[in-house]
Amino acid sequence: MLQVVLGAPQRLLKEGRQSRKLVLVVVFVALLLDNMLLTVVVPIVPTFLYATEFKDSNSSLHRGPSVSSQQALTSPAFSTIFSFFDNTTTTVEEHVPFRVTWTNGTIPPPVTEASSVPKNNCLQGIEFLEEENVRIGILFASKALMQLLVNPFVGPLTNRIGYHIPMFVGFMIMFLSTLMFAFSGTYALLFVARTLQGIGSSFSSVAGLGMLASVYTDNYERGRAMGIALGGLALGLLVGAPFGSVMYEFVGKSSPFLILAFLALLDGALQLCILWPSKVSPESAMGTSLLTLLKDPYILVAAGSICLANMGVAILEPTLPIWMMQTMCSPEWQLGLAFLPASVAYLIGTNLFGVLANKMGRWLCSLVGMVAVGISLLCVPLAHNIFGLIGPNAGLGFAIGMVDSSLMPIMGYLVDLRHTSVYGSVYAIADVAFCVGFAIGPSTGGVIVQVIGFPWLMVIIGTINIIYAPLCCFLQNPPAKEEKRAILSQECPTETQMYTFQKPTKAFPLGENSDDPSSGE
């Protein structure tokens, strides 16, 4: 009896390692934490840099004149005047010292300034905010740029050693990055933390999606699993920005990152129990080379759609909060909540079209999604307050959910159809496409905003998405591997023979046969 009780945890652990659902849970949690960390900094960084750099650099300018002006403001005659014009004394005294540096300190100027306090307060430091578009854009893009550089190495690495070790390496790097964000007080340290996040994200995303494609070999089941996993991504986007803005304003800068670090530890413990990351499990079949996959026009079309659709929200991350600070006088907590409709809609879109896209046609869902992305972006500059952003942002999130949940399974399907069924490299390409969008978007968006303004930036990226959308028609009926000779004449003979020869010998548990996972991890 005692032996049975003591052996129960080991038996449950063994069953867990054979469960496809628990593998899906591990990938879901990894994507959730990655994208929470991705978006939690969106409302924090602009206001944090504004508070630490702009206000500190201008404190000496305001400190001297404010002494003499404060003496004038505390006179009984002055307070009586402001009471006469229906302005509270407290509100006026907060803002007037900063304006007295440009006035004579007499009684009439405060009357004019009292009526324009909201406008002046909103536009204070406008030059600094415009310059911050570029710096913050580069900071946000650094994660995607590093991920872009690392992905080509992670894909082939997973083919050699399996998915488990890269997943755990990604967790450790993400944990270190989260701690750095919590205790970084300068732009340089934030940049290093963001770069580290890109490395960890590359390992987690490529290994996680490749693992799901290997476990769920049926096209319908794979689409559903990808939709659930992308739901973790969506939930991270959903929670990240509002969570970061609220915690930053009411608790402090470090608090959201410390909570994420604790959740990352739980994810690491889950990976240790389920994935057995000390075991090297290479693919028995040699995967198609990364260069060959990059020459496949159908994979390129799908990757381009992923890139451009996600570039829309990537451009909004650094530019929308600053635009709101300039035009809407938005407080800190609103900067994160502005992304809430997009995140909720993305969560709905990925889960809904993870199932529906297989029935409607994934190519059609991706086409409609890209058109909807373009239209939503065109509507963003029309908003005059945070409520006006609800519709465009919700449409944007839902449309990107359609695109991602449709095209991620297509990437695995194209490899099954036209190449060897080893998925590390193709999902490295998918992740590269995602990263290109998040690298080019923020880095160029800030520069474009400085030159032509935020509204025209939205027009440009929205129009590009609409123009690209018809290319998704080519994904309707891609030719199978037997037809590769007509598409890729140089690669066809070698790859077709390799696929035909290797398929019967494939023995990796997380591989092509749907019943194999029960004998694996």
Curated annotation (Swiss-Prot):
It comes from the Eukaryota. Signal peptide: none annotated. Coiled coil: none annotated. It catalyses: serotonin(in) + 2 H(+)(out) = serotonin(out) + 2 H(+)(in); (R)-noradrenaline(in) + 2 H(+)(out) = (R)-noradrenaline(out) + 2 H(+)(in); dopamine(in) + 2 H(+)(out) = dopamine(out) + 2 H(+)(in). Residues 43-135, 186-194, 248-253, 317-332, 384-394, 441-445 are lumenal, vesicle. Glycans are attached at residues 58, 87, 104. SUPFAM superfamilies: MFS general substrate transporter. It is found in: Cytoplasmic vesicle, Secretory vesicle membrane; Cytoplasmic vesicle, Secretory vesicle, Synaptic vesicle membrane. It holds the Pfam family MFS_1. One of its GO terms (cellular component) is terminal bouton. The keyword Transmembrane helix applies. Its main location: membrane. The chain crosses the membrane at residues 22-42, 136-155, 165-185, 195-215, 225-247, 254-276, 297-316, 333-357, 363-383, 395-415, 420-440, 446-467. Strongly inhibited by reserpine, ketanserin and methamphetamine. Also inhibited weakly by tetrabenazine. Residues 1-21, 156-164, 216-224, 277-296, 358-362, 416-419, 468-521 are cytoplasmic. Belongs to the major facilitator superfamily. Vesicular transporter family. This is Chromaffin granule amine transporter. It comes from Rattus norvegicus.
